[in-house]
Amino acid sequence: MANLPPRKVTSASKSKQDVSPLQILLQMGFRRQRALKALAATGNRSVQLASDWLLTHVSDSNIDADDPREYIFYASPTGPLLSQLLEFWDKSKSTCGWNGAHNFLPHITLVSFFKAPDDTSLNLAKAVRQVVENVGDPPKCTLKLEPYVSHNFMGLFISEEHAEYLKKIAVQYVKQVSSVSSINLEAHVKSLHITLAYHFEESSYEDLKTLVEEMQPVEHSSWELRLYSRDPRFANHQVYKVTQGYSPQASDELELVLGDYIYIEEKEFDISPDGWVHGTSWLTGLNGYLPAVYTRRTAETDAWTLLKAVSLGNNCSDCKSESGSNTDSEMAGTYPHEDAADLAYKKSEETYQEWDKYWSEVMNSRSDSILTITQGLPMNWELSKAAEEMKNNITNGTSKSRRWVFALRHGERVDLTYGPWVPHCFENDTYVRKDLNLPLKLAHRAGGKGGYVKDTPLTRLGWFQAQLVGEGMRMAGVSIKHVYASPALRCVETAQGFLDGLRADPSVKIKVEPGLFEFKNWHMPKGIDFMTPIELCKAGLNVDMTYKPYVEMDASAETMDEFFKRGEVAMQAAVNDTEKDGGNVIFIGHAITLDQMVGALHRLRDDMEDVQPYEIGRNLLKVPYCALGAMRGKPWDVVSPPCPPSINSSSGRFDWRILIK
């Protein structure tokens, strides 16, 4: 085949890949001011999100108003410290009622609210990354938080060394933004702290003080720099989340859509004679009267837009003092993991036998690729039908395309990787990690270690598998708006890993749906024991605490028909209820979930003649960890997923003693 000669002259000024989201929106017919407003309001995430925002705000009387958004720059804790702070939030709220701190996620303010034109939002987000690169990594010593308690304020103040680092970040961000624009902003450099409580009743002081004193902030914490924006019109409003849908019966009433946020002035509750209040929808920008009982107050930050999040270097592992060379006792095997020689022994031996078969196949057939052995015919994902259709929808300016609905099996699970693992990994009911692929830590649950026997977590590789799928979807340009997960811990963790890889906005939460759990009778011998939504949230999983499941599940036996019907009810209801809101849907469950999705959505067709009866087929054994199935509607058809699959080889446990000669 002849080599392709390089072109020396071209009339094209830029390729399609160089076309910006703004240019695509303009090509779709949207006015420049509206397009910029939509991109700023959705964090410049995608053309699809921006066009969806424009379509939902088509009747918003404020859509053409020249009212720039407000931005704020935070340092936000993540991981165990965030879980600890959220637990404090819950306790203080239930014990003492709402106070000012509950309006926001835990944070340290680096730059206070400032207004900026919509056409600067992308550069404001880029500046966050540039600031981290300019200032460098945070100090390597442990970050310490010092509690402070008074009658009108309670908080945690940052240790001096880390406070100086964050001040440099704040000052550098102000310089970075000011150097390229005339935006007026000011760094917050005095007494950096995390607010725990303020604007609380005097009668709550003692209870709040006790909660602060009981809390011992974890020292090994992770942090992110986050840039948020909000609609300035509602700066002094309270935010309420819709918990029950409502269709207007009068022209002055506001439609309530599950998951929407409503901006309501505090005075509305004082002047209302009948429990109806006036509010404005975050989703549509429309306003009207609504029954307050159909909403629940939530943090203002839930209705903000996250433009950029950049992780700061994890420093906790570098705080240990240096040690000398290995001692004889270390070489003899005194490490905690060395007493678990039998951990995964049987599984490892099975793996080594599979490896022997594989290498025999390679040598006999002279095959040089595992793809040849395990995959059959290769597929060109760049030219797949789904990828082409998706690409055309974007580049051709199609504002309305068929929705994606996905089904994803969970990632690699601990119990099927190691066999009986709990007896090896718990000492006096305390979890000890004895293999690098085991979880770093296990969250507290009511059932203790017995709960983990019945409800296994993911391995570290399982988390990574889930992140790979999310990353693949992100690189394919597909966003997810609605995430439903089986209540099994491995499925909820897979959902979180998927969202991490997708880099989804924190507002995209995991809805734990019992209807997606696999056949109950498979688990009857050892029982079913799920973690509660609160336990999952405390474990750092972004679970929707307000979600009301479509199916309530008990521990009684069920028939196979009842199992399939349970899944059908949940999947069909989720797809139908999210249709008006729009956005793609993913169900994260078990191996059978993929087949179950196909059957459930095919039953939404008008023509039911070709629909096959539910059954557990042989394909169940061909669904590996994090296998992804895809459908598009309407009509509902099985299509190629927008990203390729991933293949993993098994790995046995290594015994270092084989090196002793």
UniProtKB/Swiss-Prot annotation:
Its main location: cytoplasm. It is an enzyme of class 3 (hydrolase). The keyword Cytoplasm applies. CDD domains: HP_PGM_like, SH3_UBASH3, UBA_UBS3B. It catalyses: ecdysone 22-phosphate + H2O = ecdysone + phosphate; 20-hydroxyecdysone 22-phosphate + H2O = 20-hydroxyecdysone + phosphate; 2-deoxyecdysone 22-phosphate + H2O = 2-deoxyecdysone + phosphate; O-phospho-L-tyrosyl-[protein] + H2O = L-tyrosyl-[protein] + phosphate. Detected in non-diapause eggs, with highest expression between 2 and 5 days after oviposition. Not detected in other tissues tested. Competitively inhibited by 4-nitrophenyl phosphate (para-nitrophenylphosphate, pNPP). Also inhibited by tungstate, vanadate, and phosphate. Residues 16-57 form the UBA domain. Changing residue 410 to S: Abolishes catalytic activity. Residues 235-300 form the SH3 domain. GO terms for molecular function: ecdysteroid-phosphate phosphatase activity; protein homodimerization activity; protein tyrosine phosphatase activity. Homodimer. This is Ecdysteroid-phosphate phosphatase. It comes from Bombyx mori. The gene is EPP.
